[in-house]
């Protein structure tokens, strides 16, 4: 059950319409997870500094069970997320940062319990 949060300093008018759905589909493909398990949030117009600069930028946070826990996995994921984000947001790679957080089943609540018991 991946959780993906995209924060960007781009104003809402510069964020392509439907980006959240395309990011959901891309995340499912990149992480080999069913699209109906992917959760996406897109926040635009934020005051941000990336690499010491306030030029337009984005930060992606990817949290998931079992697929973001190694450097080897994340190197491949990073390449594919960067390809998607640079195209969609028209930002250079040095204006985008990605953070990967592995989750355990007990850290995700759903249906009044945690994923461990579902």
Curated annotation (Swiss-Prot):
Q: Which InterPro entries match?
A: Macrophage_inhib_fac, Tautomerase/MIF_sf
The principal localisation class reads cytoplasm
- tRNA-binding in keyword set: no
Q: Which UniProt keywords are present, listed alphabetically?
A: Acetylation, Cytoplasm, Lyase, Melanin biosynthesis
Its BP terms in the Gene Ontology are: melanin biosynthetic process
Per the record, the domain of life is Eukaryota
**Localization per record:** Cytoplasm
Gene Ontology CC terms, in alphabetical order:
cytoplasm; extracellular space
- EC number(s) per UniProt? 4.1.1.84
**Which terms does the record give in the GO molecular function aspect?**
D-dopachrome decarboxylase activity; phenylpyruvate tautomerase activity
N-acetylproline: residues bearing it: 2
List the Pfam families: MIF
Q: Which residues are annotated with the PTM N6-acetyllysine?
A: 33
Q: Which cysteines are joined by disulfide bonds?
A: none
Q: Which Gene3D superfamilies match?
A: Macrophage Migration Inhibitory Factor
Kinase as a keyword?
A: no
What reaction gets catalysed by this protein? D-dopachrome + H(+) = 5,6-dihydroxyindole + CO2
| Main function | Tautomerization of D-dopachrome with decarboxylation to give 5,6-dihydroxyindole (DHI).
> Which family does the record assign?
Belongs to the MIF family.
**Can you state the subunit structure given in the record?**
Homotrimer.
What is the protein's name according to its record?
A: D-dopachrome decarboxylase
Taxonomic lineage from the root: Eukaryota, Metazoa, Chordata, Craniata, Vertebrata
Gene (UniProt): DDT
């Amino acid at each position: 059950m991946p959780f993906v949060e995209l924060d960007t300093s781009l104003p809402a008018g510069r964020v392509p319409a439907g980006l959240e759905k395309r990011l959901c589909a891309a995340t499912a493909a990149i992480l080999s997870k069913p699209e109906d398990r992917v959760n996406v949030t897109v926040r635009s117009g934020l005051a941000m500094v990336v690499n010491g600069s306030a030029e337009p930028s984005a930060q992606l946070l990817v949290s998931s069970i079992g697929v973001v826990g190694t450097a080897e996995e994340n190197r491949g994921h990073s390449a594919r997320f960067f390809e998607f984000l640079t195209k969609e947001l028209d930002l250079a790679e040095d204006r985008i940062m990605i953070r990967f957080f592995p989750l355990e089943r007990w850290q995700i609540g759903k249906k009044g319990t945690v994923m461990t018991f579902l």
